[in-house]
Amino acid sequence: MVEVMKFTKNKIAALLSLTLLGVYGCGSTPSSSDAEGAVEDVGGTIPDFESAAFFKKVKKDHRKAEVVSDQGVTSGSSALKVNFDSVSEANKFKYWPNVKVHPDSGFWNWNAKGSLSLDITNPTDSPANIILKLADNVGVMGSGDNQLNYAVNVPAGETVPVEMLFNGTKRKLDGYWGGEKINLRNIVEFQIFVQGPMDAQTVIIDNFNLVDATGDFIEASGQEVKVSGPIPTVASITSFDEGQPTFVAFDRSAAATVTELKTDMGGLLAVKLAATNAYPNITFKAPQPWDWSEYGDFSLAFDLESKADEPLQLFVRVDDAENENWGGTANGVVDSMSSYVTLAPGDDGTFYLPLGQTGSQIVSGMRAEPPKKSYNAQAISYGWGEKSLDTSNIVSFQLYLQNPTKDAEFNIKSVRLIPNIDADATRYEGLIDQYGQFTGSEWPKKITEDEELETMGKLAKMSLKSTSQMPGRSIYGGWADGPKLKGTGFFRTEKVDGKWSLVDPQGNLFFATGVDNIRMDDTVTITGHDFADKDKRSGKEVASEVRRSMFTWLPEDDDVLAENYDYANWVHSGALKKGEVFSFYGANLQRKYGGTFSEAEKVWKDITIDRMVDWGFTTLGNWADPMFYDNKKVAYVANGWIFGDHARISTGNDYWGPIHDPFDPEFVNSVKAMTKKLMTEVDKNDPWMMGVFVDNEISWGNTKNDANHYGLVVNALSYDMKKSPAKAAFTEHLKEKYWAIEDLNTSWGVKVASWAEFEKSFDHRSRLSKNMKKDYAEMLEMLSAKYFSTVRAELKKVLPNHLYLGAPFADWGVTPEIAKGAAPYVDVMSYNLYAEDLNSKGDWSKLAELDKPSIIGEFHFGSTDSGLFHGGIVSAASQQDRAKKYTNYMNSIADNPYFVGAHWFQYIDSPTTGRAWDGENYNVGFVSITDTPYVPLVEAAKKFNQDVYMLRYKK
């Protein structure tokens, strides 16, 4: 068995290479290994200009580089000064002076990031024109669709903060091109370069940072089970021990010197590839083609040791047909798989290539993955050619260089087949037991038999209706022992002693606490099955082997628990776009409370309400099942969604989708349809209804950069006024302000021939002038005011006495102008804030200016110590830590004079295998998939709810 030697996977500093062609590289300057399954750097190691070790890795070719501390330093005490050589007209296609940043090994996963920022200083008296480039593993091999470019001009003598938006091309922003297919999970290179013809230029770079993307998508890395020792060998091709064939085809190798050596660890081949040849290689070929088909899902692995003192770019080609140079068809693209890997100086380890490329194709449909084995090895990255090979007919394979600038030396210790450690598909098999729980670990209160659920159910039913409001509470949960205000028979708001407050129907001060999503809808998970006829459940087939393999049990159609099957007609993201779903939570309710699902659900409804009362919550949060509305024990909030055929507007960065165009006359009809549906669920005279949320987390934009801030207006103005009501409204506003197009041109610094041209399209996507930003801000406020005023008008027609709670703003989806436009029309401003507490995230500086009561619609904390693989948007170390964080967060809400409550998202844990809609599998519930409460969190909530009115009003 081959020993796995030392191989450093995650080195602290990134690899900064200033070579035109990698030392052993090719014209397209490919870089370090990056295939999915290779070493993943989720946060992204980025240049550390304070590290001496980092600067030692700088190479010089067609430019000079030096560390400086007296100019261009914007963070810390050091920066990198780069003098780019001039490029003549004759050489403009021959070389591109550049600075490159690579992961030391593996790849960067920047999927949760939206941009990369850095400061660029131009210390000269001439403008500097440079280009930023980001590439994934395919991009570094030359695919323009996988290379994102951004051209930047830095004025003479200035320092410019530059932000490279990863969706800049998609948003059609000026200066961006390429990158339409870039894989942000698999980034392997960032570079700054100049394009000739160009005079010599000098810039100073510093302060690299990654900026989070908008949206609440948080991808968690799969937990890894560290495996020490060698990687298992499926089959040995050769280990070069005495008596074993080397399979070296010297007649097909080029510029290669091969020496067989014997060591205490066994035999090896010492290989030297000479730079005298454009493609020096060592080729391996057996007398007859290798047949590896019997080994199933495997990788071809090389145990290599680099003898170079600089990075070594090594290419690997595997052919399943005879080489065309010998009369066959394999040419490096056809009947060939071509790949590459970068060996750092002194690297000594296992490098592997899945010949079927199956590892990168596994889609589990879970936001966080189950544990997988983690070996000390590096993937060889797929580059081009066939995506999979005929493993029954492997004719040859070779290791080679492309256009090297110097000789390369490395040792080959063995060639073998190993398991496909990237895929590790076995980790999905038998993942979930009959209760929907992870089979691979244990935790307190994990269910092992039906009798446990039955006993818990009996105890819960025995305590039914024995709960009552906490002492000092009104029947609505208000502060009965507090000051008496005017009771109107409905919830309202009032500022009391400088603090905004809700007031219950009897006139008591009221603070809203509660839990969102008390419903069954999000408890289903994709089973992997689909049907020819979904309505009849006929023609059943396995549509996803990976999904189906996860479950050790699913009920037969004649099982009473089969009531928990359903069908998802459309899935936002996951292993399938549609298919059968199953609710383990629903099945567990039947096991726990007995009878049919309908009978068990009735018991669950009563027990859930009793829990809310016992735990001291004053409201049911957003998206409670309407069947809970008439409970007469806990107040509730209702919700509505606006759909319809009205026009939409895109920000260019829409998380959930484009926003409504409220200037479209059809929008009013869409709002009326929403209120009509809402009134089928609520009673307009119900005093228990605190208010109504309409929509949620609209993509209004944010202030992270101008593109996000003003994107709605930028896109709206690009539309044809005849097709966009918003464009028409904005145009009329601007005409009233400027009257003559020349006045607008002067103010904005643009050149528009006429208002007619402006009406057809004003597609300006470069930098915005000061006056443009001012006018765009006005139009954002107009847009917001129109949306919220329209919704309010229609909502108050049917519910004149209930609070309009707005459309909760995500911290990534609100700007000051949008909030200002909403404030006059909502009764309560609402925000979703996933953070440690109110003060740790978000800009609350405008609360006093808005002077509105405010509520948090969503927050949570999760852990991975109860069988789920994801800790949610904000994670905690344990169940006890979740409880601690809950208390800290709620205290920060109670301390703020503008906030009148907060709702936790959500009541039930996500399914372990991911909710059907988008694979979310978070431990963020107050109860588990078996309907078992998390005691530490429950106790923390009870304690806060007991003290809330004293905390809020007695300080």
UniProtKB/Swiss-Prot annotation:
Q: Which Gene3D superfamilies match?
A: Galactose-binding lectin, Glycosidases
Record's catalysed reaction(s): Hydrolysis of (1->4)-beta-D-galactosidic linkages in agarose, giving the tetramer as the predominant product
Broad enzyme group = hydrolase
Entry's Gene Ontology BP terms: carbohydrate metabolic process
Q: Name one Pfam family in it.
A: Glyco_hydro_42
Residues folding into a coiled coil are none
Q: Name one GO molecular function term.
A: beta-galactosidase activity
This chain's protein is named Beta-agarase B
